C-alpha cells in the first residue's frame, strides 16, 4: 500500500513546471527525488542498493561510455557513443586518480563480455567504489536499446548518511510522465527499506534551480 498521495505529487510537479516556465533557463532542468530516511542505522542495518527501470528516460543527456571489444567500439562509434577499448584502459595503468576521473566523467558504463572480466585487473576497484561498475552488453543485444535501458534506470544506494537524491525526470517531459516516474521510483525505494514506509522521513521533488516541494 503506497502512502504517497497522488494529489500531493501532481501538485508538486505542477508547481515545479510552473516555476520553471516563469524563469526560462538555457538548459533543461533535471527533477530530482530527494529522500530522507529515519529509524535506520547505516552502521548496523543493511545498506541497500537497487536499480529500477523507469517508464520514461529521466536524463536523456546522461553520459555513458562503452568499454568495448573491437565490434562494440565500432558500433559505438557509429552511434556517436563515447567508448574506450582495452588498450585505452591499459593506459590508465590502474592509477587511482585517473580511474576516479574516468568514473566522474560518466554517469554509467557499459562493457563487452571480454572486457568486463578484465575490469578489476585493468582498473582496480575504482568504478565499483563509485557505484558505476559497467553493465554487461552481449553481441546478441542491440547496443542502442541497452543504452536507452541504462538511461531509464535509476539506482538507489544507501551510503553513510540517511539522505539521497535520484534523478526521476526533467522539465522537457510531460507532467504525467514525471508523475509515473516518481510513483515507480518511490514504490521501488520503499520496497528496499526494512520497515518500508516506517523508514521514510520525508520525500521532496526539486528541479535543478527550483526550491524543493515536499510530497511526503
Curated annotation (Swiss-Prot):
Looking up InterPro entries in the UniProt record yields: eL8/uL1-like, Ribosomal_uL1, Ribosomal_uL1-like, Ribosomal_uL1/biogenesis, Ribosomal_uL1_3-a/b-sand, Ribosomal_uL1_CS
Q: What biological process terms from GO does the record include?
A: translation
Keywords associated with the record:
Ribonucleoprotein, Ribosomal protein
Write out the GO MF terms. RNA binding; structural constituent of ribosome
One Pfam family for this entry, by name?
Answer: Ribosomal_L1
Report one GO cellular component: cytosolic ribosome
Gene3D superfamilies xref list? 3.30.190.20, 3.40.50.790
The organism's superkingdom is given as: Eukaryota
What SUPFAM superfamilies does the database record attribute to this sequence?
Ribosomal protein L1
Show the PANTHER family listed in the entry.
RIBOSOMAL PROTEIN L7AE FAMILY MEMBER
Q: How does it assemble?
A: Interacts with the GTPase NUG2.
State the family named in the UniProt similarity comment for this chain: Belongs to the universal ribosomal protein uL1 family.
Under which name does UniProt file this protein?
Large ribosomal subunit protein uL1z
Native species of this protein? Arabidopsis thaliana (Mouse-ear cress)
Amino acid at each position: 500500500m503506497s502512502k504517497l498521495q497522488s494529489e500531493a505529487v501532481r501538485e508538486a510537479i505542477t508547481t515545479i513546471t510552473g516555476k520553471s516556465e516563469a524563469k526560462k533557463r538555457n538548459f533543461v532542468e533535471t527533477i530530482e527525488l530527494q529522500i530522507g530516511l529515519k529509524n535506520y542505522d547505516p552502521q548496523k542495518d543493511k545498506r541497500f542498493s537497487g536499480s529500477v527501470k523507469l517508464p520514461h528516460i529521466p536524463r536523456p543527456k546522461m553520459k555513458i561510455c562503452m568499454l568495448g571489444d573491437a565490434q562494440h567500439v565500432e558500433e559505438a562509434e557509429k552511434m556517436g557513443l563515447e567508448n574506450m577499448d582495452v588498450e585505452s584502459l591499459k593506459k590508465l595503468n590502474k592509477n587511482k586518480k585517473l580511474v576516479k576521473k574516468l568514473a566522474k566523467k560518466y554517469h554509467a558504463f557499459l562493457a563487452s563480455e571480454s572486457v568486463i572480466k578484465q575490469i578489476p585487473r585493468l582498473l582496480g576497484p575504482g568504478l565499483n567504489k563509485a557505484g558505476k561498475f559497467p553493465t554487461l552488453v552481449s553481441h546478441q543485444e542491440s547496443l542502442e536499446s541497452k543504452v536507452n535501458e541504462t538511461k531509464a534506470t535509476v539506482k538507489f544506494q544507501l551510503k553513510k548518511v540517511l539522505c539521497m537524491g535520484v534523478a526521476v525526470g526533467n522539465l522537457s517531459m510531460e507532467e504525467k510522465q514525471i508523475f509515473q516516474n516518481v510513483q515507480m521510483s518511490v514504490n521501488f525505494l520503499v520496497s528496499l527499506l526494512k520497515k518500508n514506509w516506517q523508514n521514510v522521513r520525508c520525500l521532496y521533488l526539486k528541479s535543478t534551480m527550483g526550491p524543493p516541494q515536499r510530497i511526503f
